[in-house]
Structures are given as structure tokens and as C-alpha cells.
């Protein structure tokens, strides 16, 4: 959770920088540069533990305007996740990311998190973007 709050904080700060820099620059280039900077910093730490999870990957695809993170649970296999996991995780993901202007305005950017079990089987894929945040 700390990692995602860290990413959220960085994105919030970067979004303010984006607004000021975007006056003279193309917004997509500014967002891409900020995201790539964050990716570079976080990749130095991978793999590392975030509570019950291990961060496996962080990627920025500027062409697709996407931030992608991938993590796996340290102990749970697919059948060990609680039944309400998907509902709670989706609610928390949307709440955390839809506050960010990069994802709650029509920039075209999205953030995706892929959650895997201890065997690296996909448990859930979460996304936040303008369309999702507008609901």
C-alpha cells in the first residue's frame, strides 16, 4: 500500500508540474517524461516487498499512454484470496487513482495494475482512466 501511496503522491506532484510545464510543451510529452522519471527511480528497487506483495514490474508506454504495475502476493495462491477481494481492490484502486488529474481528465492516459498470486497467475487487473473515473 505504501508503494501505491508513494506513486499516487509522485503523480500528484508531477501533475502540478505538468500543468505548469504544459503551457509551453506538449502535454503528452510532459506526462511521458514525468512517468518515465518515476519508472526509472522505482525500477532500481525491483523486486521489493510492499506489505503482502512483491513488486515485479513497473512500465510506462508513452505511445499507449499507459502506466503499468505488476505485483504478486507473497503467500496467497488463487484460491486463497477472499471472495470480496475484487470488489475491495477495485474500489480502493479507483479511489486512489481517480484523484489524480492525469487519470481523471481526458488526457488519454491510464494506469493499470496486474495482481498475481504466489504462482504468478493473474488474480485481478485494475485500471483507472478518464472513462472509468468519470463513472
What are the roles of these predicted feature ranges?
Residues 1-24:
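Classical Sec-dependent N-terminal signal peptides that target proteins to the secretory pathway
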Residues 18, 82-88, 116-123:
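Short, intrinsically disordered, charge-biased short linear motifs at domain edges
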Residues 22-36:
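N-terminal low-complexity, Pro/Thr/Ser-rich intrinsically disordered segments
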